[in-house]
Amino acid sequence: MKDSLLPLSGRKYYLENVPREKALERLLQEIGKFEEFYSENIPAQDALGRITHIQVNALISSPHFHAAAMDGYGIEAKKTFGASPINPKSFKIGTDIFPLDTGDPLPIDTDAVVMIENVNQIAENEIQLESSISPWQNVRVAGEDIVEGQLIFPAGHQLSAVDLGALLAAGILDIEVRKRLEVAIIPTGDELVPPGKELQDGDLLEFNSVVMSNLLEDWGAVPKVFPIVKDNFEEIEKVVSEAIEKCDVVLVNAGSSAGREDYTSSIIEKLGKLLVHGVAIFPGKPTIMGLCKNSKDIEKTVFGIPGYPVSAVLAMSEFVKPTLAHLIGINVPSVQKVKALLGRKTASRLGMEEFLRVKMGIVKDKMLAIPAKRGASVISSLVEADGIVRIPRNSEGLEANQELDVELLRPLEKIEKNILMVGSHDNALDLLIVALQRKFGYQLSVSSVGSMAGLVALKNEEAHFAGTHLLDPDSGEYNWSYIKRYMPNVEVVVVNFVEREQGIFVRPGNPKNIKNFS
């Protein structure tokens, strides 16, 4: 984009370094919560995951009548008093005692149910009891589960599957819930192309909107994805203006760092108030937060979400998710955490809170966390990660074997079945990953850090096995000399996993007639 197309006020090359907590606090203090008109009535059976807008009270009791809790006979309990094996009492069926199935209403003037196995039928219409029964025995009294007028759920309660059953049992067919927030996602960038289009040099697939959309749906919002917008100030401004008219929250993806064509902060300043431009986290530093007023003078929250995938996901979870929860008046669910020992020393930049992705597993009864890839653009690092470790801003890193809290990205029971492999990578490991998962339900977690690092990890009991292909130039032998040198007192089993040939690829027909190389 040419500078002449951009207003003089349109570009500001600055980034703050606001601590994460203060950045979020600054935003939440500026925005309010949804008002009463942001609610809707929907069928109770369709309300899974929705948030109650007002308190919910039962319209009927459940059960709304006295019901038999067992198969048997309904009777007035006092008529059975004194019955015993030596002094049995007899009752006429249909006159004194009445046959009932579980759930049937009790006949008038009865207050107990005799279980069918406790009666002796002595005639076609007569039974005998050899024991007495107390009032209301084997009876579900009216309102045993829910009483008419009883508080079922307070306002702000997120409805689960069993909650829907309780609503219907209480006679509630429709329920007032808080409106699901509609969130605009605006991908920006000249280099972006939609999935399925043939790629040219310089093209980048736009997939962040898919990731962001599904995160929003998980959090109960309704994503509205706009078409890709080119790096043009006026075009982006136009789409943002349209989005704040239609949606409750707006996410502009990319256009948030201090580059030449990053316009989000300037657009927010033009349309409203810029609150934060730059947060002291890695990945995710270029995150932007602000408020923009639409034509109805209603302020809408606008985020600039970094373009790198990992940065985008972290900005979403750390800022967008709590903002959505704040707007509809609920708390952000807590994340499951476990204690783990860090597998190796890890440096970090002072002044930045780092979200370190880790692979996890149990080795010798110790839960280990092995640092994974750290780049902001490496989405595979999130795919492969089992958890996140937060390195504080005032820290220059973490020590090996340091105990720390790990926020889990997978269920703990799956992590406990992980097999940790550290060392040299080989494509055949993909086959092993598939086989272990399919046949045994185990997940092979591979940290490709080189053969020597693998041997060190195995020696330090930081892996289940190591991948290595180290050639001894003196003997021409693979691996053994290194194992003996670096693991002299460690008992190991050496498995020849795969044999392979290495070489180079040439163009079809070998036009340059390459025969060897050195």
Residue spans of the language-model regions?
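Phosphate-interaction motifs
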Residues: K2-D174, V338-L341, F355, I391, ...
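Flexible glycine/proline-rich
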Residues: E21-E25, E35, S39-Q45, G49, ...
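Phosphate-binding glycine-rich loops and their immediate beta-loop-alpha structural context
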Residues: V141-V252, K417-V446
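Short, Asp-centered acidic motifs that coordinate Mg2+ and/or phosphate
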Residues: V249, H464-F465
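Short Gly/Thr/Asp-enriched flexible loops that form oxyanion-binding sites at enzyme active sites
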Residues: G259-L271
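Beta->alpha turn/N-cap motifs
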Residues: G450-S451, G467-P473, W480
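Short helices/loops that flank or line small-molecule/ion binding pockets
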Residues: M452-H464
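A conserved helix-loop-strand patch within extracytoplasmic ligand-binding domains
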Residues: Y482-S518
